[in-house]
Amino acid sequence: MRTEVLCQWVDTINPVISPSQWESCKVEGLRLNPESDTWLAIDLSPDRKQAALVASQKLEGDKFQVILLQTWHNPSNLDDKALANDLAEWVRKYPVQLVAYSARTASAVAARLAPAGIRTEPIDGLDYAQSCDELLGAISSQRLAHSGQDELTKQCLSAVKLPFGDGGWVMGRKVSNAVICGAVASAMATHYATKANDGVDIVIV
C-alpha cells in the first residue's frame, strides 16, 4: 500500500492487507440480512477520538460478510454513554449474538451494554492475535466479502503488522499512524463469523 505524504507517495511499512486481495473480496450490493445471526464488534482509537462498529454475518458455504455500520469522531474525547446508546439501536435491528470489544479500548462502552442485557465478550491478547490471523486468512482465500465501503477500505489498508510474542502478530493501533478502528473491529467480528456451527471445521473419515 502507498500513502500520500506532502504530495509524495511512500510505501506503508509492513501492511497487513494487500490492496489487490482486498479488492478481490469486493461484492457489489451486499446487505445485512435482518433475520441472520449477527456479530458486532466495536473498537476505539488509543486517543479515544475515533471509533468504529462493524457487523459480520455468515453467507453461503464458508463465506461471510463484514459491513461497517457506524463511525464516531470527537476532536476532544468520545462519550462512552453515547456510543453505547448508538450501539444498542443497532442491536435492536438484527439478531445480534454478541458484541465483541477490546478491553484495552472499549471496556467503558461494554460496561454500559451489559446492564441492558446485551452480551459482550472481550478479545485481547492471544485471542486478538488469532482474530487478526483469521481476518488475513479469510481475505487471502476470498472467504470474506465486503461491499467496498470507502471508509472501511481506507482503514483496513492502513493497518500495519506489529510483532506479538514469538512468531505472532497483530494489527497495531499506534504503529499504523492512522485510524484503523474499522480494521480491528473487522478482525474481531471475523473471529465469530468464521466459527463452524458445530465447532468442527475439518472432518477426517
Feature-to-residue mapping (PLM):
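Gly/Thr-rich phosphate-binding beta-strand-loop-beta motif of the actin/hexokinase/Hsp70
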Residues: 32-58
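Flexible loop/turn segments at secondary-structure boundaries
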Residues: 12-15, 47-51, 61-63, 75-76, ...
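Short glycine-rich phosphate-binding loop at a beta-alpha junction
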Residues: 94-110, 121
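Nucleic-acid-processing active sites and adjacent nucleic-acid-binding tracks
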Residues: 31, 55-101
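Beta-sheet entry/capping signal
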Residues: 37-39, 50-52, 63-65, 96-99, ...
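Metal-dependent DNA phosphodiester-chemistry modules and their immediately adjacent helices/loops
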Residues: 66, 93, 112-199, 205
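Short, flexible loop/turn elements at secondary-structure junctions
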Residues: 7-9, 44-48, 57, 103-105, ...
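ATPase catalytic-site recognition across NTP-hydrolyzing enzymes
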Residues: 1-42
